[in-house]
Amino acid sequence: MTLFLPGQEQRTRVASAIAALLATAFVVLAITGTARMYTPVPYWDMWSATLGFYMAVNDGASWLWWAQHNEHRIVLSRLLFWLDYEIFGGKSIFLLVMNYVIVAMAVVLFWRISRAQLAHLSDPARRNTVFFTTCFLVAWLYQWMQQENLAWAFQSQFFLAQLLPLCAFYVLHKSALNDKAQLTFVAACLLGITSAGTMANGILALPLMVAYALIAR
């Protein structure tokens, strides 16, 4: 059992507060930067890939849902683009919010992974390590270095192309730990299939999952 002396506990609390403040600062600064850069006017690829797509689909060109955007098939992002125009007035606010929501989902996924990987530690060491790791991940994923992705309403596919394959592998790993986890395995397969609708690199998720399933069988 790990023993924490009063002085150590106090230092841990101070360090935790600092880590939480820094992580919060990164998020607040990112949101502030996004708000300052916001414009409802479509930018660059958005003219054809969001506004043009929405108008064409409404005119009956349903095949565009699966059409390539360069080498990618951005089916899931097109669903978000369609919702933005159909429900939220095409002002891109919904799309920007979704960028942050998807990143938050990635943080939650990494939090779950870190908890599982650190399960061998005893409390409070495990709890503190997971907390500091999560704060670091929040700051890392919301850093303004990737402002072009966070502040541009067209970029949800870049986040989804990382999140969904990672989710698929995580769920597949969970199913491998339990011989009776058929539903979990099906969910992993569905996530792998869905990954193909993010970007071109998402196509690799299913073949790699098959390889992992054979190894972990």
Language-model region placement:
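Transmembrane-helix signature of polytopic, membrane-embedded enzymes
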Residues: 114-143, 162-163
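Perimembrane helix-loop-helix junctions
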Residues: 2-6, 204-217
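Membrane-interface transmembrane helices that cradle and orient dolichyl/undecaprenyl
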Residues: 160-184
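Membrane-proximal lumenal/periplasmic loop motifs of glycosylation machinery
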Residues: 37-42, 55-86, 91-101
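Membrane-interface alpha helices of multi-pass inner-membrane proteins
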Residues: 183-198, 205-210
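Start-transfer (signal-anchor) and selected internal transmembrane alpha helices
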Residues: 1-30
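Helix-to-loop transition at the C-terminal end of transmembrane segments
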Residues: 29-49, 145-149
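Transmembrane-helix motifs of polytopic, lipid-linked glycan transferases
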Residues: 97-124, 167-171
